[in-house]
Design a protein with these regions (language model features):
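Near-N-terminal "mature-domain entry" segment
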Residues: 2-110, 114-121
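Internal, well-folded beta-alpha domain core
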Residues: 85-230, 234, 238-239
Length: 239
């Protein structure tokens, strides 16, 4: 079983891991191209302000320095902050390393303990690597790191989950709804929080198959059998 998560633009650099560090060949190709960009080209690619341009330019130029971060500690978006509210991944390191994969436009499919550096890049950006878009470049590279027919619990955004042919796996999409006066609604913020908490709950409860996932009951969410299908689990919270 694998749990896939999207990365986050927001990052925390308060838990550095000083160590020798080598980029994979796939990631090095991307960094080399980014280093070749002028500031004007980089700003156009990243679509950032002058302040953020300087910050990201500096990150790229210093990419070979030895200070890195564990992926789960570095990413600090809403899903990851919610994850950390439920459980500490280092206390469940074996499960986290075996089952959780964060999908990155720079690093590919990485485990929570993999050492990475801060960056700003997503699959929708117009960067070309060997004539390929970022999405096409990573599609085969990411997918081949998963076994065919294994269970994949999708807690990632459509940007990353669309890399996969879902029919080749025991795939489970997960959606979260709030129900008020009989009406179901989805909210991006609530869904992001719930994805992070579900990943942490699965880790802390040593979930090994998708049927166990139906027991998830954090923050008032409960499995709704009437809305769910074999490959699509829906969780509803009454408000």
């Amino acid at each position: 079983m694998k749990i896939i998560m999207s990365p986050a633009k927001e990052m925390a650099i308060d838990l550095p891991v000083p160590k020798d560090w080598v980029l994979t060949q796939d990631s090095q190709k991307i960094v080399s191209i980014l280093k070749s960009y002028s500031k004007e080209e980089l700003q156009k690619l990243l679509k950032v302000s002058d302040t953020l341009l300087e910050e990201n330019w500096d990150k790229i130029q210093k990419f070979q320095e030895s200070v890195t971060y564990h992926a789960m500690d570095l990413y600090h978006g809403l899903a990851f902050r919610s994850f950390k509210q439920v459980a500490n991944w280092e206390e469940h390191r074996d499960y986290a390393v075996k089952h959780i994969r964060i999908l990155s436009a720079l690093y590919g499919a990485i485990s929570p303990e993999e050492c990475v550096k801060p960056y700003r890049l997503d699959l929708t950006m117009s960067l070309k690597i060997e004539g390929e878009t970022l999405k096409r470049y990573w599609k085969e590279r990411i997918v081949t790191s998963f076994e065919k027919e294994e269970c994949i619990v999708n807690l990632a955004s459509s940007e990353f989950s669309s890399l996969f042919n879902k029919k080749q796996y025991d795939w489970v999409d997960v959606d979260f709804f709030e129900k008020k006066e009989g009406v179901l609604k989805q909210h991006s913020t609530i869904s992001k929080k719930a994805r992070g908490k579900m990943a942490a709950w699965m880790m802390s409860h040593d979930v090994q198959n998708k049927s166990e996932l139906q027991k998830f009951n954090v923050d008032g969410f409960a499995f709704d059998a009437s809305l769910s299908r074999e490959n699509h689990y829906c969780f509803v919270k009454g408000i």
